[in-house]
Regions:
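Acidic/histidine-rich catalytic cores of soluble enzymes
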Residues: 137-229
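Active-site acidic/histidine proton-transfer and metal-coordination neighborhood
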Residues: 76-177, 241
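Acidic-and-aromatic substrate-binding clefts and catalytic sites of carbohydrate-active enzymes
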Residues: 18-20, 37-49, 68-78, 152-160, ...
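Acidic (Asp/Glu)-rich catalytic clusters
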Residues: 22-28, 45-62, 78-93, 134-139, ...
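Boundary/entry segment of secreted carbohydrate-active catalytic domains
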Residues: 1-22
């Protein structure tokens, strides 16, 4: 048996539908669970009842994919209302979403991309992101954590490095950061494929070192897939060894921030997620 260090990070898993019943039956030792906020927006029903059961046994973190914090058209009022209601009902330990956009306007009508799309790292995009984050925090009356994105395109209009951009966001809004370690590595691998990053691991460690430690409220860990011409953050496999290396560096830098194992594609047995969570505790 591996002894857990006294100063080990708090670690949770993403609680997905295939494991709803099994988790509640087994009640394994976990520091917290995380769910996708939008899956529980319905008023009442089986999903919310299940989440309430989980909340009775574990602290819950709400992780969103739909606020579209970087969208110039602003925050969707209905979406924010549903999130605020869920936060009031569940009283989560953390609430988070992504530094991305998903909504825009075409021919006078709003459209939704149904995906997490990257934003440029420049002053104009920062102004939009800050305004939207502030609106969410004012509505929820609590701090929001903002996650760095896995981005498959870059913008010629970007004139800031991502860590500097995120640091400025936290300074202006008081929000925190959810640092997705796998996303950092996926982006570096794709930059290597594009001929712009000779040493992805070193680039990731530099990225981590550039982030203000006090702003980091949580880490994400996940797997990715190399398609040959692009690396995809698919959350469909175990955490890769280079990501563990970056994670160890991040924990030393950020002071053992809470960490979460994400697995959303080809979801395995619950035992596999628990094994990964145990590694995050002891790595």
């Amino acid at each position: 048996m591996t002894n857990t260090p006294a100063n080990a990070a708090t670690v949770g898993i993403g609680w997905r539908h295939p494991h709803y019943g099994e988790l509640l039956e087994q009640l394994p030792s976990l520091d917290f669970i995380e769910v996708h906020s939008e899956n529980f927006f319905a008023a009442g029903g089986a999903a919310l009842a299940t989440l309430r059961q989980g909340r009775a046994h574990y602290p819950v973190s709400l992780h969103g994919v739909g606020l579209a914090l970087g969208s110039a058209v602003g925050i969707d009022a209905w979406h924010l209302d549903q999130l605020a209601r869920l936060v009031e009902q569940i009283e989560p330990i953390r609430v988070s979403d992504h530094a991305c956009f998903a909504r825009g306007q075409a021919q006078g009508e709003q459209i939704h991309a149904a995906d997490l799309l990257p934003i440029p790292f420049n002053a104009a995009a920062l102004d939009v992101l800050c305004a939207n984050v502030q609106r969410v925090q004012e509505r929820l009356k609590r701090q929001l954590l903002v996650e760095n994105l896995s981005a498959y395109v870059s913008f010629t209009s970007s004139d800031q490095l991502e860590p500097d951009f995120l640091n400025a966001l936290t300074q202006r809004t008081g929000c925190g950061l959810l640092v997705d370690v796998n996303n950092i590595y996926v982006n570096a691998l794709n930059e290597q494929l594009a001929g712009r990053c000779p040493d992805p691991l070193a680039a990731c460690l530099t990225w981590v070192d550039a982030i203000a430690p006090a702003s980091v409220g949580q880490l994400h860990l996940a797997g990715h897939i190399n398609m040959g011409d692009v690396v995809i953050d698919d959350h469909g496999s175990r955490v890769r060894e280079p990501v563990w290396q970056i994670y160890r560096h991040a924990q030393a830098r950020f002071g053992n921030a809470p960490a979460l194992i994400e697995w959303d594609t080809d979801v395995p047995q619950l035992a596999v997620l628990l094994e990964e969570a145990a590694l995050a505790k002891t790595t």
